[in-house]
Amino acid sequence: MGRTIVVTGGSSGIGRAIAAVFAAAGDRVFITGRTERTIVAAAKELDASHSGEVIAVVCDSTRPRDLAKLVDEVDEHVDVLVNASGGLVAGKPCDDPLEELSETWSAYIAQNVLGAVLTTAALRELLGPRSTIISIGSIGAERRGGAYGAAKAALAAWSAGLSAELGPQGVTANVVSPGYITGTDFFQGGMTDARHELLVGETHDKRPGTPEDVAELVFFLASPGARHITGQTIHVNGGAFTTR
């Protein structure tokens, strides 16, 4: 019998690739998204092309009422929770610069930190020994990432604390931190040829990453072979940012 997986932000890009790799292994995968049309379509396509069942749940991870519905929908032990929702936030013009700045930062924190915190708290009682929580971070947390980078840095700090909190119960928690990944909404909008060449040039393998690169690492972290890996931020960027 397959595992039960929850992937937030599963309608496209990295989240969808993560859902696909688990569904291909025969797992039962719940994917969430804010827009009913796109999340339902993604679930149907993934379900039709993989052995595992894929179920769509319309859910905004920053809204407690939506998360209560997600818990009711899942209603069983969760083996793997992947917090993949987040990304850039479209700012709202405002006459007051400070008010605009406040709203922008609040939105980035909500989308990239609070959603993961609330989703994990909502599903906490469905997690158990040998469950794992994987949150998608960003290379922006290590660089001049502005509000987005600051939010992803906060996500990593929260995840490390979560690992310490839940470790005694046999639950692992890690962050997977991608660099430049093609085929995602994050990079598609304003990507110029010059910017593409610059980002690829920063890597050691001279290629952009793919959503599948991230998904395969997430899949490994959810495997029995990764039970002693917890409290970590693991980078997937082709060497564009290195650690020691």
Question: What name fits each language-model region?
Answer:
Residues 11-13, 35:
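Conserved glycine-rich cofactor-binding loop
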Residues 72, 87-106, 147, 188-191:
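Conserved mid-core segment of classical short-chain dehydrogenase/reductases
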Residues 100-104, 132-168, 180-181:
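Catalytic loop of short-chain dehydrogenase/reductase
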Residues 167, 172, 229-231:
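Short, small/polar-rich loop/turn modules that mediate ligand/substrate recognition or access, typified
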Residues 168, 181-203, 243-244:
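A glycine/serine/threonine-rich, flexible loop-to-helix segment
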Residues 203-214, 225:
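A conserved structural motif in NAD(P)-dependent oxidoreductases
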Residues 219, 230-244:
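Short C-terminal tail/terminal secondary-structure segment
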